[in-house]
Amino acid sequence: MTDNNHYENNENSENSSENSHHEARAGAFERFSNRKKRFRENAQKNAESPNHEAPSHHKKERHPNKKPNHHKAKHTPQKTRNYAQEELDNNKVEGVTEILHVNERGTLGFHKELKKGVEANNKIQVEHLNPHYKMNLNSKASVKITPLGGLGEIGGNMMVIETPKSAIVIDAGMSFPKEGLFGVDILIPDFSYLHQIKDKIAGIIITHAHEDHIGATPYLFKELQFPLYGTPLSLGLIGSKFDEHGLKKYRSYFKIVEKRCPISVGEFIIEWIHITHSIIDSSALAIQTKAGTIIHTGDFKIDHTPVDNLPTDLYRLAHYGEKGVMLLLSDSTNSHKSGTTPSESTIAPAFDTLFKEAQGRVIMSTFSSNIHRVYQVIQYGIKYNRKIAVIGRSMEKNLDIARELGYIHLPYQSFIEANEVAKYPDNEVLIVTTGSQGETMSALYRMATDEHRHISIKPNDLVIISAKAIPGNEASVSAVLNFLIKKEAKVAYQEFDNIHVSGHAAQEEQKLMLRLIKPKFFLPVHGEYNHVARHKQTAISCGVPEKNIYLMEDGDQVEVGPMFIKKVGTIKSGKSYVDNQSNLSIDTSIVQQREEVASAGVFAATIFVNKNKQALLESSQFSSLGLVGFKDEKHLTKEIQGGLELLLKSSNAEILNNPKKLEDHTRNFIRKALFKKFRKYPAIICHVHAT
């Protein structure tokens, strides 16, 4: 067909459409019948003809009352015909159905036509909710998920995702020890499995810069080194840790990533997606594999009014959801909390009120990584003409890095050093410090116990603890509160509304994530078993089949493919102990010995034996710690001495002439004697010298 024929056909179509509109307004029934007949003919014609693309050289449609400008058409580029208008004119539009039963007496035919519309919309809705058909369901590929930390506990997050030839490690975090692990400051995951698969690990993938996600990185790099991918703040804080550990040379492994820019890491294609949390520059991960797409939310909340005005990238999450997601791994920390988590910006009015009413110094303690929280309180300090002293190594370091990288902007002239605080009136000072978890070496703890070199708590101080105690730290936080209250300071803690908000999604935000991603399979992560179990119920309420959900524990290995999810094994997992003051790992046996000493005490014996007489010498010494008081010490010593003398008299020459056998023989006797008396097994230090 020539261009002119196209042009004329289009003009006739427009004239026909114009006439049909006039006839409809006139109410001519004959014309309506012809229109209905023409609609059916066009529908039949369209059904028989294959769809085709509109040629790019078609002329632009003109108004039917305008005369064609043949000279202009001859010398200007031809434009695409308005096919949408032609479809409307031909009474045939995709997604729209004409009502044919217009003049029937009843409503049977009319309702049948409406019901077809209901069925069509239901089909669209079902396809929208279940986009898994877009996945390659015939793929035989699969991935294996192995959590090494972060399940069955709060913190210590680390996970391996692997194929037969490639693997990535998501995060490397630390956790706090429970009470009773004496001399242990932090716990880190056991890296044994990483040593087993080290040859196929393509990189470490960091979601955000909280300690429970990056705290183990320097300890890992002391054993194994891999490319480390993260956003600028994450790498900045990890780099600072590496400096403290003497690992500066390993910065060469750092890879700065950009959000919304997928990159290849081994056999995986990974995209960092911006999400809101209680630290700047947090990310979810979209991980494309041959088996299908995996979304890992990291720690998240859905904050529509964050301090930096950078909300969660819901559009990008929905993009992957529409394409079809095989597996979702989502944060379960706040799964028991109904509703939504308040925005970080909602704490501003509470801070304003507290500053307005404060008569003396304001001392605020929070997590050093919560830079937006620190930023907000400093802004109010500036508003109320207070000088700001930032005290605590991690707080100073994190704030300096955030300022240097341009995440926050604060006037340098507003800041003073700790030794300058006494130079200013109390009502002109704001102290921002560490210690919200009751850490005994923190600045707040030392202020409360008069151990800080420059600052002690005063009766007129207002102390704001803008944090919630991490499970396991409740007793430590309570101890600090007691010290502060004894000093007659006013303390703003949990009973004050809106001075702390969580960084984790509550149930309604978890539901929104599930609805956006629409995963085929679901693995709730981050939390104790009760947290992931509650998250499972939320997922079921959002349409994820129960059979498609698995509740993992550290060490479980779960294999996932387009058509299945199953547990395939268990590997060795656990914790390594760290003395954070020396940055050194502590052997498990040492921790066990400390537990033994703390629970049952110590008995020490230095024994001198005359082999020929089979008797104890008077130079033998005995002492105990944590078993009896000083008054009973001599009585206990006499009991043990008497028993040993009888033991030696009954010992044969083989034992007496073998130093090792004699020492073991003596140790076992003391152990049994002490258990019989105290029903405990104290730690026994025993040295035997036979002459």
Summary of predicted features, one role per range:
Residues 100-205, 210-424, 442-456, 475-477:
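His/Asp/Glu-rich metal-coordinating catalytic cores
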Residues 145-147, 254-256, 327-329, 463, ...:
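Conserved beta-strand scaffold positions in the cores of enzyme catalytic domains, especially
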Residues 1-119, 123:
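Intrinsically disordered, low-complexity RNA-associated tracts
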